[in-house]
Regions:
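AMP-dependent adenylate-forming
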Residues: 1-13, 19, 26-35, 149-186, ...
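AMP-binding/adenylate-forming domain of the ANL superfamily
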Residues: 3-196, 211-212, 218, 318, ...
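ATP-dependent adenylate-forming carboxylate-activation enzymes
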Residues: 21, 105-109, 123-139, 153-156, ...
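Conserved AMP-binding
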Residues: 26, 57, 105-108, 129, ...
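Phosphopantetheine-dependent thiolation modules in NRPS/PKS and related acyl-activating systems
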Residues: 147, 484-486, 493, 530-637, ...
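Conserved AMP-binding/adenylation subdomain of ANL enzymes
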Residues: 207-236, 244-283
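Gly/Ser/Thr-rich phosphate-binding loop
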Residues: 255-258, 282-286, 296-360, 364, ...
Length: 757
């Protein structure tokens, strides 16, 4: 017996089959037993020190180019000799023993040689950045308790400002040739400190994170498969070694015998980066999604034929970034996405090509790298069920040593292994969800999540939705404060071309993809977003100025006292000015909660009772003023119908709610109307209790009969389209029954979340 199953059945039954298959192909190597030769070889490399591994590479590739920047280039032998001289000069200044050494260099070859020299001397380095404010560098010098600053001619004067009786200075360009360039052969262990890196702290002061040699060596040994770096590769170094991604690129390259190409994006800019890439022909490109996004805007699909691997680090990768990769590089280069943190180095990664299916929500970051396990924990520290959202936590032997001089913070963020092993658990502060096969989806920072109108919102999800708009080049979203104690969302947009998209267009675009509470109230257009190390600097974004957005509706000033009063109330609620009488409340950033505030203020201003339904029906100042001023409005006959969408050329759709017609339901109607289609007239039906009338005690049949009179007075003949939600579905069903008894046709009857009639 045999049977055939059509493609349609497979597509309907397994809609994510393609994604599952493509992810399965990208899964990392399985965990190996501890007596496996592969595992033993890996452990032997991890138990080395960084200098020991580097010197092995020097012996293997003595004449191969190690680093090149502009006209300056060093082979592995030359780089090793320079590092050895620097190491001896440091030992002459400080003596032996592990201690922090501050480095003050611009992005380039000098800092690379000096890092190796510090490690060869048995010390650990503290990288400073000449472009940082003096106060920040001074804080890191004082907090790290460094006794020596190493620099070069270009930065020596800046370094002199930090010298005191307890801190010396070493200029590497004054090191004499008399110092030996041979390897030092010091005993350095994998658990010894290697570097002290400072990241932004929640208290406003940077916090130092101390790493060991094995942190670097573990990443180097875990870099396998299609993304593995070989001695034939040419790697970009775009990030400063002050940051983890820069150090990662440096050692991934030099501990594999490849050639490193530093480039200063801050100085040369994106246009300079494109020209430099064409000239140097790297095989591996590594950046943040923000830099990648800007770079690709000026490249054709034939550019950079030498690339075989593109690495993107960070959690802000969007569907647009992936589409850019597919359009420009997918035919010849793989894409690797990495999730990293300074405390853990790489956490997750996956390598993909154009076959990958990008998830609808969140940023894909892949599978845990070998030697690390991902736990998703709830607020009580318990693992959540797979598929649920939790804080991403990393369990491993190869975490950083902890926070420098902050045992309290180390104890709070680095937890002991509850099973009593030698591993620890680091709480990243990131939120995520794990798919059934172990693939991790990043859902944003725990501390970036905000509550908007009672809902927890991750700005990154809104940013990714905005980036999927064809006219948006870059986007950032932040939560801002508005009185009284209300937060609202502001979106910062970099358009691909000028003029950019209208605010109404972006708002409607998002309404088809996100809940109403995730739609930004304000949109600010910028030439570029402020970046720090390739990531969005949210603190540097300008405060929203409250200016009226560019709308499809021309500005018309208030013409009389009623319109002026309304405009003033709208301004207070929406924090927007000026407001025209033809401007739609919802196009200005209004939402259900703002509508409730507005209605309350209008009642105080005009000494009258207003309902939110009035704002849904009359969303402009001009329309609302007519209702306030017109005596006919006070005496008009009660109507169940709330017009939500005018439409044209089609029979109307009538919607019956499941509740009692409260404020929030009118906005549910309006949202549903947009999804039905703008061409359809759409009417909500409200009960008498919606405007203070006594709730009906009648039977379902009598309630349906009342509704039906209203419906048929508006549309005498069928066919009819009726939608009912929850309890409203029972009434909708009864209305359909009564219409059929009258010989009328029912074109559409939809019952949503309703009990069986």
């Amino acid at each position: 017996m045999s049977c055939a199953v059509g493609d349609g059945f497979m597509a309907e039954t397994f809609p994510n089959l393609e994604a599952e298959i493509s992810r399965y192909a990208m899964r990392p190597n399985p965990v190996v037993a501890r007596n496996d030769p592969t595992y033993i070889a890996q452990q032997q490399k991890i138990e080395q020190s960084i200098p020991e591994r580097f010197e092995e590479i020097v012996r293997t590739y003595p004449d191969r180019l190690a680093v090149k920047m502009g006209a300056r280039a060093l082979t592995y032998t030359q780089l090793n000799q320079a590092a050895n001289r620097i190491a001896r000069a440091i030992l002459e200044k400080c003596g032996s023993g592990s201690e922090p050494i501050a480095l003050l260099f611009e992005h380039g070859i000098d800092v690379i040689a000096t890092i190796l020299g510090v490690l060869k001397a048995g010390k650990f380095y503290v990288p400073l950045d000449p472009s940082f404010p003096l106060e920040r560098n001074s804080y890191m010098l004082e907090d790290s308790q460094t006794a020596l600053i190493v620099t070069n001619n270009r930065n020596v004067e800046l370094a002199r400002t930090s010298i005191n009786k307890s801190r010396a200075l070493l200029n590497i360009e004054e090191i004499g040739k008399a110092l030996s360039s041979d390897d030092l052969g010091l005993s350095i262990f994998s658990h010894d400190p290697s570097d002290l890196s400072y990241t932004s702290g929640s208290t406003g002061q940077p916090k130092g994170i101390l790493k060991a040699h094995w942190n670097v060596l573990h990443i180097f040994t875990s870099d396998k498969g299609r993304a593995a770096i070989s001695a034939e590769d040419r790697l970009t170094l775009l990030h400063s070694v002050v940051f983890g991604s820069g150090k990662g690129d440096l050692f991934t390259c030099l501990l594999n015998g490849a050639c490193l190409f530093p480039f200063n994006v801050k100085v040369e800019g994106i246009h300079g980066l494109a020209s430099w890439l064409r000239e140097e022909r790297p095989t591996v490109f590594h950046s943040t999604p923000a830099v990648f996004r800007q770079l690709l805007a000026g490249l054709s699909s034939h550019d950079l034929p030498s690339l075989r691997l593109i690495r993107l680090t960070g959690t802000s990768i969007s569907r647009t970034d992936f589409d850019l990769y597919k359009d420009k590089f997918a035919k010849r280069a793989l894409l690797e996405i990495l999730l990293t943190s300074t405390e853990t180095n790489a956490i997750c990664s996956f390598v993909t090509d154009e076959a990958f299916v990008f998830p609808k929500h969140g940023a894909p970051v892949g599978y845990p790298i070998r030697g690390k396990r991902i736990l998703l924990l709830d607020e009580n520290g318990h693992e959540v069920t797979r598929g649920e959202i939790g804080e991403i936590s990393v369990k491993s032997r190869y975490l950083s040593l902890g926070y420098w001089r902050r045992p309290d913070l180390t104890e709070a963020r680095f937890l002991p292994d509850p099973d009593g092993g030698d591993e620890r658990i680091y709480l990243t502060g990131d939120m995520g969800r794990m798919l059934p096969d172990g693939f991790l989806i990043h859902l944003g920072r725990k501390d970036f999540m905000v509550k908007i109108r009672g809902y927890r919102v991750e700005p990154g999800e809104i940013e990714r939705a905005l980036l999927s708009h064809s006219a948006v080049k870059d986007a950032g979203v932040v939560a801002c404060d508005r009185e009284p104690k209300e937060k609202y969302l502001a979106a910062y947009i970099v358009p691909r071309e000028n003029p950019g998209p209208k605010v109404e267009e972006l708002r409607n675009f998002l309404k088809d993809r996100l809940p109403d509470y995730m739609i930004p109230s304000t949109f600010i257009f910028m030439e570029s977003l402020p970046l720090t190390n390739g990531k969005l600097d949210r603190k540097a974004l300008p405060e929203p100025d409250g200016k009226r957005p560019e709308l499809n509706t021309a500005y018309v000033a208030p013409r009389n006292e009623t319109e002026q009063k309304l405009a003033q109330v709208w301004k207070e609620v929406l924090n927007v000015h000026p407001i025209g009488i033809c401007d739609n409340f919802f196009d200005l950033g209004g939402h259900s909660l703002a509508a409730s505030h507005l209605i309350s203020k209008l009642g105080q201003e005009f000494h009258a009772d207003f309902q939110v339904a009035a704002l849904v029906m009359f969303p402009t100042i001009q329309e609302l003023a007519k209702q306030i001023e017109g005596e006919s409005a006070k005496n008009q006959q009660w109507s169940y119908l709330v017009p939500l969408q005018p439409g044209s050329g089609h029979k109307p759709v009538f919607f019956l709610p499941g509740g009692i017609g409260g404020d929030q339901e009118f906005f549910v109607y309006a949202r549903l109307a947009r999804h039905v289609g703008m061409q359809y007239p759409f009417y909500g039906l409200k009960p008498r209790s919606a405007e203070g009338r006594e709730p009906s005690q009648a039977s379902v049949e009598e309630i349906a009969r009342d509704y039906l009179k209203e419906i048929r007075s508006f549309q005498p003949e069928g066919p009819y389209s009726i939608v009912g939600e929850c309890a409203g579905g029972i009434i909708a069903y009864e209305i359909a029954q009564q219409l059929r008894e009258h010989g009328q046709e029912i074109a559409l009857l939809v019952l949503m979340d309703s009990p069986r009639p």
